[in-house]
């Protein structure tokens, strides 16, 4: 059997493919602020609609945020909020 007949397996390294949601949100926030937009309104617009036009290309923010699924971003935001506002 030739090597062309075998199925190849492609593996991603978890470390290299893992995008840090926190870092991406901070970069996107800063890019929006630098361009004169209200960062919170724009990020919420993107999360609700999925339309990347809410995020500028400035500082590669649009490409960065699109690498993360919107539900993953929302999950991280909820986790962070609850951790910060938990009663002891």
Swiss-Prot record:
Q: Which residues form a coiled coil?
A: none
Task: List, alphabetically, the InterPro entries matched.
Answer: IreB (IPR009309)
Superkingdom of origin = Bacteria
The family note in this entry says:
Belongs to the UPF0297 family.
Concerning PANTHER family, the annotation shows: UPF0297 PROTEIN YRZL
Q: What is this protein's name?
A: UPF0297 protein BLi02868/BL02032
Source organism of this protein record: Bacillus licheniformis (strain ATCC 14580 / DSM 13 / JCM 2505 / CCUG 7422 / NBRC 12200 / NCIMB 9375 / NCTC 10341 / NRRL NRS-1264 / Gibson 46)
């Amino acid at each position: 059997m030739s090597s062309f007949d075998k199925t190849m397996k492609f593996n991603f390294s978890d470390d290299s493919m893992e995008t840090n949601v926190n870092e991406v949100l901070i970069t996107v926030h800063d890019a929006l602020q630098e361009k004169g937009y209200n960062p919170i309104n724009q990020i919420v617009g993107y999360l609700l609609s999925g339309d990347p036009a809410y995020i500028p290309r400035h500082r590669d923010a649009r490409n960065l945020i699109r690498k993360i699924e919107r539900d993953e971003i929302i999950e991280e935001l909820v986790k962070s909020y609850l951790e910060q506002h938990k009663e002891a």
